């Protein structure tokens, strides 16, 4: 099983507002940059989209070390998801889960891809080269969204 390190980030100018996502993937023999943007979106949606697009770009099951600077994504996947599903996509306060469309896509992708994922939190804007690279790509995605107006 190939080992892949992934760094993801989301950015938003206004929340909601134009946003972008970026992902930097690296393995022993290759690197890949992914980015995109949307107009009326939120930072959390862009953080999630970055993870979805990065995992979807992998063509076969991999051992993934996934670095995110979003506690929302990290805790959603490692702490909250099972409870949300058990409650029919409701929070502990019985409210609908926000961004349920993306949570369901991410859950489906993780559970059917065959990837083994080690979720890791990295402090954003703190000099981590992989995170800084993903941040640059996310900002490129914002620029792309703004050009599409």
UniProtKB/Swiss-Prot annotation:
Top EC class of this enzyme = hydrolase
Q: Name one Pfam family in it.
A: RNase_H
Which InterPro entries does the entry link to?
RNase_H, RNaseH-like_sf, RNaseH_domain, RNaseH_sf, RNaseHI
Q: What is its main location?
A: cytoplasm
Q: Where is the RNase H type-1 domain?
A: 1-143
Q: Name one GO cellular component term.
A: cytoplasm
> Is Magnesium among this UniProt entry's keywords?
yes
GO molecular function ontology, one term from the record: RNA-DNA hybrid ribonuclease activity
Q: Write down how the cofactor binds this protein.
A: Binds 1 Mg(2+) ion per subunit. May bind a second metal ion at a regulatory site, or after substrate binding.
Keyword Metal-binding listed? The answer is: yes
> Which cofactor names does the annotation list?
Mg(2+)
Q: Where would you find this protein in the cell?
A: Cytoplasm
EC number in record: 3.1.26.4
Which NCBIfam families does this chain map to?
A: PRK00203.1
Q: How does it assemble?
A: Monomer.
Q: Which family does it belong to?
A: Belongs to the RNase H family.
This one is known as: Ribonuclease H
User: Origin organism of this chain?
Assistant: Albidiferax ferrireducens (strain ATCC BAA-621 / DSM 15236 / T118) (Rhodoferax ferrireducens)
């Amino acid at each position: 099983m190939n080992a892949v390190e992934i760094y993801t980030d989301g950015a938003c100018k206004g929340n909601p507002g134009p946003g972008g996502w970026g992902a930097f993937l690296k393995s022993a023999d290759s690197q890949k940059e992914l980015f995109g943007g949307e107009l009326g979106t939120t930072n959390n949606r862009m953080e999630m989209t970055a993870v979805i697009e990065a995992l979807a770009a992998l063509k076969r099951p991999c051992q993934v070390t996934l670095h995110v600077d979003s506690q929302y994504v990290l805790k959603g996947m490692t702490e909250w998801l099972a409870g949300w599903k058990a409650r029919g996509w409701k929070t502990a306060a019985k409210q609908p889960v926000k961004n349920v469309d993306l949570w369901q896509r991410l859950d489906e992708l993780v559970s059917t891809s065959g990837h083994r994922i080690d979720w890791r939190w990295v402090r954003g804007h703190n000099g981590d080269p992989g995170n800084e690279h993903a941040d640059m790509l996310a900002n490129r995605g914002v620029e792309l969204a703004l050009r599409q107006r």
